[in-house]
């Protein structure tokens, strides 16, 4: 099979895009689960989300994203800029 085959290249691009979507979805589920545990410690969400809970979830997600970005940058520096 020739690596310059346009169909193969399209397939590989689609496969890469799907893999990225799956990783993103997995990240969202992970963040949701962790922040749920932090912000709803009794495992019972209120019937209506109040300002305190909404702020908790926003702060939790933001901290998780910050931590993830920090780790990516740190690992990138350790690899000499190659992630």
From Swiss-Prot:
Chain span(s) of sequence motif Twin CX3C motif: 35-60
Signal peptide start and end residues: none
Cysteine disulfide links: 35-60, 39-56
InterPro entries given in the database record: Tim10-like, Tim10-like_dom_sf
Name of a matching Pfam family: zf-Tim10_DDP
Function according to Swiss-Prot or TrEMBL: Mitochondrial intermembrane chaperone that participates in the import and insertion of some multi-pass transmembrane proteins into the mitochondrial inner membrane. Also required for the transfer of beta-barrel precursors from the TOM complex to the sorting and assembly machinery (SAM complex) of the outer membrane. Acts as a chaperone-like protein that protects the hydrophobic precursors from aggregation and guide them through the mitochondrial intermembrane space.
Keyword Metal-binding: yes
Principal cellular location given in the protein's record: mitochondrion
Cellular component terms (Gene Ontology): mitochondrial inner membrane
Disruption outcome: Worms display mitochondria with an interconnected morphology, presumably due to defects in the assembly of outer membrane fission/fusion components.
Record membrane topology: Peripheral membrane protein
Recorded family membership: Belongs to the small Tim family.
Subcellular location per the Swiss-Prot or TrEMBL entry: Mitochondrion inner membrane
Protein name: Mitochondrial import inner membrane translocase subunit Tim8
Keyword annotations from UniProtKB, A to Z: Chaperone, Disulfide bond, Membrane, Metal-binding, Mitochondrion, Mitochondrion inner membrane, Protein transport, Translocation, Transport, Zinc
């Amino acid at each position: 099979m020739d690596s310059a085959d346009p169909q193969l290249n399209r397939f590989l691009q689609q496969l890469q895009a799907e893999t990225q979507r799956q990783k993103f979805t997995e990240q969202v589920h992970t963040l949701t689960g962790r922040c749920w545990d932090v912000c709803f410690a009794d495992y019972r969400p209120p019937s209506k989300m109040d300002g305190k809970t909404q702020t908790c979830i926003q702060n939790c997600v933001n901290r998780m994203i910050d931590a993830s970005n920090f780790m990516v940058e740190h690992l990138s520096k350790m690899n000499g800029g190659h992630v």
